[in-house]
A protein has these predicted regions:
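Predominantly late transmembrane helices and immediately cytosolic-facing juxtamembrane segments
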Residues: 34, 38, 106-144, 180, ...
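Alpha-helical transmembrane segments of polytopic integral membrane proteins
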Residues: 38-41, 50, 81, 90-91, ...
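Aromatic-capped, Gly/Pro-kinked transmembrane alpha-helices
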Residues: 172-210, 221-280
Length: 280
């Protein structure tokens, strides 16, 4: 999932500035809220008779309240909203990147801020298109939409607890006052990057929350208040939209560079080896 790739990006630039505990901390918290979102998506698909296109959903909060609340929890953690797990782990990564005081560290910091804005926007785009606004589903599918049975909801509830509390409960051990005792000799720290991160300027600490709220409000305007705006916006940047919508044409490029040559090579070996030598 591309969202997971972006969160792995946070972990890797934490490693790049030497904030190894912060990277592992985010790996742990991310496991809870991303698994919650994955299973929440499966819950929606199950309740919508295998429909997977958000453009064919909407208004499902009235039909799937438990799933909706759980996915809100996962999204709040992913966006780094205070008290949720992602707030503690993602923010210490951004603060560590800033505290590195290197060119690459500052580049990572601002790239992480941009990613935080986009993360909040696309997360609430998902929530608004799926659970809020008017429904775009056909009458039969919408009327029969439902939360899954308890046996499917139970794992989501466990993950939701982790998405809410794991960051707060673990922060002192992973990146706080008990960090040295917790890690022991497991991680070699060459400098005090985590300690420096805790003394980052106030604007550095506040900025991730500001951009997260901005992304949420942007999605609210675009998909609830002014649902016609996305189409107008897309029409104005059609070439860029086509490029991004097709994932930078990465699949097509991969097919041409890797898949097709592999098939050609395989056929060649089959004809010259198996066909000509073994069977011939």
């Amino acid at each position: 999932a591309y969202s997971t790739c972006s969160q792995l990006g946070y972990m890797f630039f934490a490693l790049g500035v030497g904030a190894y505990p912060a990277a592992i901390f985010h790996l742990m918290t991310h496991a809870f809220f991303k698994a919650l979102l994955f299973l929440g998506a499966g819950s929606v698909i199950h309740g919508m008779d295998d429909e997977q296109d958000m453009r064919m959903m909407g208004g499902l909060f009235s039909k799937m309240k438990v799933t909706a609340v759980l996915m809100w929890i996962g999204s709040l953690a992913l966006a780094g909203v205070p008290i949720f797990a992602g707030f503690y782990s993602k923010d210490i990564i951004l603060e560590s990147a800033f505290a590195a005081h290197t060119g690459l560290g500052l580049y990572a910091f601002w790239a992480g801020i941009a990613a935080a804005l986009m993360t909040a926007f696309y997360s609430w785009r998902l929530l608004f298109l799926t659970f809020h606004g008017r429904t775009r589903a056909d009458d039969h599918t919408f009327d029969h939409a439902h939360d899954p049975p308890p046996v499917m909801i139970a794992p989501l509830l466990v993950l939701a607890l982790g998405a809410i509390f794991s960051g707060f409960l673990a922060k002192e051990y992973f990146v706080g006052h008990q960090m040295d005792e917790f890690w022991g000799s497991s991680i070699l720290m060459l400098h005090n990057i985590i300690e420096d991160a805790h003394h980052a300027p106030a604007w550095v600490i506040a900025l991730p929350l500001v951009v997260a709220v901005t992304g949420i409000l942007g999605a609210f305007v675009m998909y609830i208040l002014k649902p016609g705006w996305p189409a107008v916006f897309v029409a104005r940047i059609r070439p860029l939209h086509t490029f991004v919508y097709n994932k930078w044409f990465f699949d097509e490029l991969y097919d041409r560079i890797c898949v097709r040559p592999s098939f050609v090579l395989g056929r060649g070996f089959w004809k010259s080896g198996d066909g000509a030598v073994i069977d011939g």
